[in-house]
Amino acid sequence: MESVAYILILTLAIGVLFFAIAFREPPRIEKKEEK
């Protein structure tokens, strides 16, 4: 049962990290399109 909690916390951490990166990526992608 402990592994389930660890996986949940890990997934949540990765999800938040991915969300933060995905939100900071779009602006840079727009600049790349200009090139």
From Swiss-Prot:
Signal peptide boundaries: none
Upper lineage ranks?
Bacteria, Bacillati, Cyanobacteriota, Cyanophyceae, Nostocales
CC per GO annotation: photosystem II reaction center; plasma membrane-derived thylakoid membrane
Superkingdom per UniProt: Bacteria
Task of the protein = Found at the monomer-monomer interface of the photosystem II (PS II) dimer, plays a role in assembly and dimerization of PSII. PSII is a light-driven water plastoquinone oxidoreductase, using light energy to abstract electrons from H(2)O, generating a proton gradient subsequently used for ATP formation.
Transport among the record's keywords? no
Q: GO:BP terms for this protein?
A: photosynthesis
| Protein name as it appears in the record | Photosystem II reaction center protein T
Q: How does it sit in the membrane?
A: Single-pass membrane protein
- Organism source for this protein? Nostoc sp. (strain PCC 7120 / SAG 25.82 / UTEX 2576)
- Tell me the protein family, please: Belongs to the PsbT family.
Q: Which HAMAP family match?
A: PSII_PsbT
Just give the chief location class. Answer: membrane
Cellular compartment(s): Cellular thylakoid membrane
- Membrane spanning segments where? 3-23
Recite the UniProt keywords alphabetically: Membrane, Photosynthesis, Photosystem II, Thylakoid, Transmembrane, Transmembrane helix
Instruction: Give the quaternary structure.
Output: PSII is composed of 1 copy each of membrane proteins PsbA, PsbB, PsbC, PsbD, PsbE, PsbF, PsbH, PsbI, PsbJ, PsbK, PsbL, PsbM, PsbT, PsbX, PsbY, PsbZ, Psb30/Ycf12, peripheral proteins PsbO, CyanoQ (PsbQ), PsbU, PsbV and a large number of cofactors. It forms dimeric complexes.
Q: Name one Pfam family in it.
A: PsbT
